[in-house]
Amino acid sequence: MQDHKIFDIPGFVTQSGFTLNVKLAYKTFGKLAPDGGNAVVIPTFYGGRHSDTEFMIAPGRSIDTRRYFVVIPNMLGNGHSSSPSNTPAPYGRGGFPLTTLYDNVMCQHRLLTEHLA
């Protein structure tokens, strides 16, 4: 069973010039305030997944979900988002294009402004 959601970004052009139909995995906690002022983004680290940061997110914890709406986007290449292991040819496996932090930030920005806003 999948414990995260997927945001599809068709035709995303990477910094290295490849065009991919990106799947950005993410998980949210808490409730977004009407003005959006309680949103907190916790980026994952290279190879890390949303589940690696969940220990600090809960009512009464350092990132209190009674107060904050938390978004944890997974990086490209981590196995949940578009990765060599789950992207169809011609970009699957060894053909997966180079992706950068810039690409990740651009995808995460789109998640926040186009999908969760």
Language-model segments: what does each one mean?
Residues 1-39:
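Catalytic-loop region of hydrolases
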Residues 7-9, 43, 73, 108:
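Generic structural hydrophobic/aromatic packing signal, biased to beta-strands
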Residues 12-16, 58-61, 110-114:
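Catalytic micro-motifs at enzyme active sites that drive phosphoryl/nucleotidyl and oxygen chemistry
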Residues 20, 99-102:
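Conserved phosphate-coordination/catalytic loops
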Residues 27-89:
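N-terminal cap/lid subdomain of alpha/beta-hydrolase-fold enzymes
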Residues 91, 95, 102-117:
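Conserved acidic catalytic loop of the alpha/beta-hydrolase fold
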